[in-house]
C-alpha cells in the first residue's frame, strides 16, 4: 500500500465528551472496568458487556495473541527554544534497521503540542542531559530520520515522559501506559487494546481453556496521516507462538488478536515466509511496512480485540478486513449513541467471526 490509496473512513464526528480523558483508575475503578462491544460477522445484533466478561465470550480452544512490547517515555522537550517557534518537543517514534530513529517534531511542550512541519537536514537539537539529536533526512511530511548522541532507550527511560495528546489534560506516570503483558521496551505509544487486561482476567481466560501467546511489535506514533507512506515497525513472532497459532487453527479454535499491532505482526510474518496463502503462521522477525486492509485480507487471524478508532484513522482500514461497511457503521453508531469512550484509556470492541 502506498500513500496514493485513499482512506476508507467511516464518516463521523468524534465529540469531545466521547474522549477518555483519564484512565479508569482515576475514578477509583479497576483497569478492566471498561465497556466491551461485541460484533459478529453475519450477525446483525451487537452485544454490549463489561470487559470483565471477556473470558465468557471466548471459547475453550481459542488462542489469544498479545503484544508484549512495553511503552517507552518517548517525549522529550528541547532545552533551547527554537527561533520563531519557541519550545520544541521530540516524539521518538521508531527504531530503524540502520540504527537511526524516526522522530516527530512538535511545537510546544507538555500537553499542548502540535505537529511541526519545519526542519532541515543536519539540524541539531539540544536535549536534556547534554545530549544532541541530529536530523539527517526527511522521511515524510511530519517524520524525520534522526540520530541521538547516546543510546536512545536508556536515555528516554531517564529523561523522557509518556507521549500525551490534548484530550488527556494531566500527566500520568509511565505505568499508566503499560499493559499487563509489557516485557520488551520499544513502543512510542501503548498497544492500548490490551490495557484493560488484569491478572484476574488472564487467570479467568486460562481457566476457561483459552491459551495466550505473545508477539512483539514496537508501535510508532499514532495513525498514518492521509498521503503518508507506511513506516517500518520492528516485530518478532516467536516459533512457539507460530506453532500455537497453527495448532489452534488445525484443531478448530479461533485466533484472536489483542490489538491491531498483533494482527500486523502475525500477518507480516506469514507473508514474509510465503505461508499466508495457506493460512499458516510463521516465525519471523524484522521490520514490516505491511498494512492490513480489506483488500489484503487476513490469513491467520480470525478475530480482533481493539479500541475505538478516530475518523480517518488508518486503523479503520484494518477493521475492514474483519467486518463489512454496514457492520462497522452500525458498531460506531452504537458506540457514539451509547456513550462509549475513545482513545487509549477508553472502551474496546471485539470483532468475532
Segments predicted by a language model, with ranges:
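A cross-family signal for N-terminal binding/gating loops and helix N-caps
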Residues: 1-353
Amino acid at each position: 500500500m502506498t500513500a496514493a490509496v485513499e482512506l476508507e473512513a467511516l464518516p463521523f464526528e468524534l465529540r469531545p465528551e466521547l474522549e477518555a480523558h483519564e484512565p479508569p483508575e482515576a475514578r477509583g475503578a479497576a483497569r478492566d472496568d471498561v465497556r466491551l462491544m461485541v460484533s459478529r460477522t453475519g450477525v446483525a445484533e451487537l452485544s454490549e458487556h463489561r470487559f470483565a466478561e471477556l473470558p465468557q465470550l471466548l471459547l475453550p480452544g481459542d488462542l489469544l495473541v498479545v503484544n508484549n512490547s512495553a511503552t517507552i517515555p518517548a517525549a522529550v522537550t528541547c532545552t533551547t527554544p527554537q527561533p520563531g517557534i519557541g519550545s520544541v518537543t521530540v516524539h521518538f517514534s521508531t527504531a530503524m534497521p540502520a540504527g537511526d530513529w524516526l522522530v516527530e517534531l512538535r511545537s510546544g511542550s507538555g500537553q499542548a503540542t502540535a505537529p511541526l512541519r519545519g526542519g532541515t537536514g543536519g539540524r541539531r537539537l539540544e536535549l536534556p542531559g547534554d545530549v544532541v539529536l541530529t536530523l539527517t533526512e526527511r522521511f515524510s511530511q511530519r517524520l524525520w530520520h534522526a540520530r541521538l548522541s547516546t543510546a536512545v532507550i536508556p536515555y528516554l527511560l531517564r529523561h523522557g515522559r509518556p507521549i500525551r495528546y490534548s484530550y488527556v489534560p494531566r500527566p500520568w506516570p509511565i505505568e499508566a501506559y503499560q499493559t499487563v503483558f509489557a516485557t520488551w521496551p520499544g513502543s512510542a505509544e501503548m498497544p492500548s487494546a490490551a490495557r484493560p487486561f488484569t491478572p484476574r482476567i488472564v487467570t479467568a481466560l486460562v481457566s476457561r481453556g483459552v491459551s495466550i501467546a505473545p508477539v512483539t511489535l514496537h508501535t510508532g506514533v499514532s495513525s498514518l496521516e492521509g498521503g503518508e507512506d507506511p513506516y517500518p515497525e520492528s516485530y518478532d513472532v516467536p516459533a512457539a507462538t507460530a506453532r500455537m497459532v497453527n495448532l489452534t487453527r488445525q484443531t478448530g479454535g479461533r485466533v484472536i488478536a489483542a490489538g491491531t499491532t498483533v494482527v500486523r505482526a502475525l500477518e507480516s510474518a506469514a507473508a514474509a515466509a510465503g505461508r499466508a496463502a495457506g493460512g499458516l503462521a510463521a516465525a519471523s522477525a524484522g521490520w514490516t511496512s505491511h498494512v492490513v486492509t480489506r483488500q489484503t485480507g487476513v490469513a491467520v487471524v480470525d478475530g480482533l480485540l481493539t479500541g475505538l478508532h478516530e475518523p480517518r484513522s488508518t486503523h479503520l482500514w484494518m477493521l475492514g478486513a474483519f467486518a463489512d461497511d454496514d457492520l462497522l457503521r452500525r458498531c460506531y453508531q452504537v458506540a457514539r449513541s451509547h456513550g462509549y469512550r475513545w482513545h487509549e484509556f477508553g472502551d474496546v470492541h471485539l470483532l468475532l467471526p
